[in-house]
């Protein structure tokens, strides 16, 4: 009887939880980022598409001798790269900056080769140079 009650509780909870999380699911969103080069006089902000949102995860309730369960992160599924030119760079300095543009996203393991797996930043734009705002790349 206890097994049946536990199964019923978990199945109803799963149905309720699947109706939609409180946070948006993993998806492409518009974000403003910054690009700069130490040799160029200005920093440029630009709008692009990144992956962000909630990925369902599980945590063991009881301590176990097993390794922790890997937690999925919102990461790129399909992407392409775009480039912008930093103005005012001196001769001999490459003024081009390339960045990924998310076409679609998925929940999966964190791969440091193409994702920033950290949490939210206190300051999303961090320019050491004077700011030249307003470029849009989607």
From Swiss-Prot:
Keyword Signal: yes
Signal peptide positions on this chain: 1-17
Family matches, as InterPro entries: Cystine-knot_cytokine, Glyco_hormone_CN, Gonadotropin_bsu, Gonadotropin_bsu_CS
Disulfide bridge map: 26-74, 40-89, 43-127, 51-105, 55-107, 110-117
Residues listed as glycosylation sites in the UniProt record: 30
Pfam families xrefs: Cys_knot
Alphabetical GO biological process terms: G protein-coupled receptor signaling pathway
Localization annotation: Secreted
SMART domains: GHB (SM00068)
Coiled coil regions in record: none
Keyword tags: Disulfide bond, Glycoprotein, Hormone, Secreted, Signal
One GO CC term, this protein: extracellular space
Keyword DNA repair: no
Molecular function GO labels: hormone activity
Highest rank taxon of the organism: Eukaryota
UniProt similarity note: Belongs to the glycoprotein hormones subunit beta family.
Function field: Promotes spermatogenesis and ovulation by stimulating the testes and ovaries to synthesize steroids.
Assembly information from the UniProt record: Heterodimer of a common alpha chain and a unique beta chain which confers biological specificity to thyrotropin, lutropin, follitropin and gonadotropin.
Name of this protein: Lutropin subunit beta
Species annotation: Canis lupus familiaris (Dog)
Taxonomic lineage from the root: Eukaryota, Metazoa, Chordata, Craniata, Vertebrata
